[in-house]
């Protein structure tokens, strides 16, 4: 179980509800979020924002920027619930900040699906030291 949580920390969003984010990514892309996106490119997983390597990596960059805009909640600590109906993610959360967090996660899951054609296996376990200088949102 401890190994699962260590690996789970490598997910795209590290912050927020890792389980919910992982489920969204799996539902939208059909890919395992940990093995496919956990250490992908320069922006998926742990670390700061860098110049994206491709469309998939850009999704993770935008997701980190989305989390940066959150107010009144902590993406590292707070969680949420959502539903998945008719192949659609529904953020049915009453708390405004948790709803924003859910919407950030929904957006990255959809973005990853829309960028499946940009997914490049050479970026799957990409060394961060090869990433260009940090980029701003």
Curated annotation (Swiss-Prot):
Q: Where is this site: Cationic membrane-docking site (MDoS)?
A: 128, 133
Tissues in which the UniProt entry reports expression: Expressed by the venom gland.
Q: Which domain of life is it from?
A: Eukaryota
Keywords, sorted A to Z: Disulfide bond, Myotoxin, Secreted, Signal, Toxin
**Chain residue ranges for the region called Important for membrane-damaging activities in eukaryotes and bacteria:** 121-133
List the Gene Ontology MF annotations in alphabetical order. Answer: calcium ion binding; calcium-dependent phospholipase A2 activity; phospholipid binding; toxin activity
The question of whether Disulfide bond is a record keyword is answered with yes
One Pfam match, given by its short name, reads Phospholip_A2_1
- Residues flagged as site, Important residue of the cationic membrane-docking site (MDoS): 121, 124
Q: Name its GO BP terms in alphabetical order.
A: arachidonate secretion; lipid catabolic process; negative regulation of T cell proliferation; phospholipid metabolic process
> Disulfide bonds, which pairs?
42-131, 44-60, 59-111, 65-137, 66-104, 73-97, 91-102
Subunit description = Homodimer; non-covalently linked.
Tell me the protein family, please: Belongs to the phospholipase A2 family. Group II subfamily. K49 sub-subfamily.
What is this protein for, i.e. what is its function?
Answer: Snake venom phospholipase A2 homolog that lacks enzymatic activity. Displays edema-inducing activities and may be myotoxic. A model of myotoxic mechanism has been proposed: an apo Lys49-PLA2 is activated by the entrance of a hydrophobic molecule (e.g. fatty acid) at the hydrophobic channel of the protein leading to a reorientation of a monomer.
* Protein name (Swiss-Prot/TrEMBL): Basic phospholipase A2 homolog Cax-K49
Which organism encodes this protein? Answer: Crotalus atrox (Western diamondback rattlesnake)
What broad taxonomic lineage does this protein's source fall under?
Eukaryota, Metazoa, Chordata, Craniata, Vertebrata
């Amino acid at each position: 179980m401890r190994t699962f949580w260590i690996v789970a920390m490598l997910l795209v969003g590290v912050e927020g509800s890792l389980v919910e984010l992982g489920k969204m990514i799996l539902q939208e892309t059909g890919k395992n979020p940990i093995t496919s996106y956990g250490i992908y490119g320069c922006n998926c997983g742990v670390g700061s924002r860098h110049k994206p390597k491709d469309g998939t990596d850009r999704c993770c960059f935008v997701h980190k920027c989305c989390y940066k805009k959150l107010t009144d909640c902590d993406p590292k600590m707070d969680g949420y619930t959502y539903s998945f109906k008719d192949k659609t993610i529904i953020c049915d959360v009453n708390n405004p900040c948790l709803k924003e967090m859910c919407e950030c996660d929904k957006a990255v899951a959809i973005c990853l699906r829309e960028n499946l054609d940009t997914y490049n296996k050479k970026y799957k376990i990409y060394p961060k030291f090869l990433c260009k200088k940090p980029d701003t949102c």
